[in-house]
Structure formats: C-alpha cells, structure tokens
Amino acid sequence: TFFQNASHELKTPLMAIQGYAEGIQAGVMDTGGAADVILEESDRMTELVEELLDISKIDMGRQRLTLSETDIRELLYDGIRAVEPIAAGGIAIVPDFPEEPVMVSCDDTQLRRAVTNILSNGVRYARSELRLTCRVDKRHVTIRIQDDGDGIAEEDLPHIFDRFYMGKSGKSGIGLALTREIIHLHKGTIRARNGDTGAIFEISIPVSR
C-alpha cells in the first residue's frame, strides 16, 4: 500500500541517521564526517516527506496550481543553477535555448521542481555532459534532457515513472512519479527513452496563446 511503501522509504534515511548518531555516541566515528552524513540524510528525508505530501494532495485533488506567465528559458536556467553543486565534480551542463522568450502559463514553483528533478537525475548518471534543449512550435514547448551515461535498463523503462518502483539500480522512490503528476497537471506529457548515448527525458507542455 501507499503507506507501507512510504514508511519503507522513510526508514532508509532514518536508519542511516541513527547508525551514525550511535557511532558518534560510542566514539567510534569521526564526528565531522558523521555529522555531514546525518545532515545529508536529514535533507533527503525532508525532501521525501515533501514529495509524499504533494503526491497525496494530488491523489485527493487538492494540489492547486498557481499559474503565471513565465519565460520557460528562465525557469530552465534556474534548474541548471540548482543542480550546479551536484555537477561540480566534472559534469558539463550544455543549454540550447531559443533566442526569443518562450512564454508558458505554469505554476513556476512546481514546474521548476519537476525540471530540476530530471536534471539532478541526469547529472548523477552522466559521465561528462548533460544537454538541455528547448524547442517551441505553435502549440507546445518541448524540453529535452539527455545525459551521456549508460542509459536506463530496458526492463525498467516501462516503469520509470511508477511510484516506489525499484529498478535494476536497486533504488526506489517517488521523485519521477511526482514529476509526471506535475507535468500532467500542466496538461503536458513526459516520456523517457534511451538515445545513442545515455537516457533522454522529453517534457512537452502547451505554450501560451
């Protein structure tokens, strides 16, 4: 059930926090290093709780979008800035956007969150480069995020947006599921596939009329 899966997800960072705290208490762990892990896992748990709350709001029909006219390029640049600390280890993020503003009616906070989630995944799995492109036609803007990693296991592709799905990597979660729900709230679509190198995520949402 949802609650069983949620409690399992929360248990993982809690166990790490408890383990490192006990290590400090027993004097068998470096205090600074253990404190860093505790802080990281606390942040991870906070993010997970927020995702669980948001997905439950969507399920109950209580997630309301606060729409405004937004230049999607600025939102994408915000996403790049958000993941730059993760990419600092040698991953180049290469943007390719139109020169003119690309206006969409969106909930700036929620859509930025969805894009940043895909970007952060891409940075983690990229070897050296993450390409972020934006294209627009009369009806839609298409955002494409492609890494140069190993791609997504073929057996995982049909389930990549499923809640709590544990794929070949052994990791599970609801980040991608929440991303899909946010895109759907914007009357858009999102899909994942493998390219010649790495994974490709494509988001399509309506442009402003």
Roles of regions detected by a PLM:
Residues 40-48:
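Short alpha-helical segment of the dimerization/phosphotransfer core of two-component systems
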Residues 175, 179:
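Short alpha-helical Gxxx[C/S/T] motif in the catalytic ATP-binding
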Residues 129-139:
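Short beta-strand/loop element within the Bergerat-fold HATPase_c
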Residues 60-65, 103-106:
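Conserved micro-motifs of the catalytic ATP-binding
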Residues 66-69, 92-102:
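Conserved catalytic submotifs in the C-terminal HATPase_c
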Residues 152-164:
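Short conserved segment of the HATPase_c
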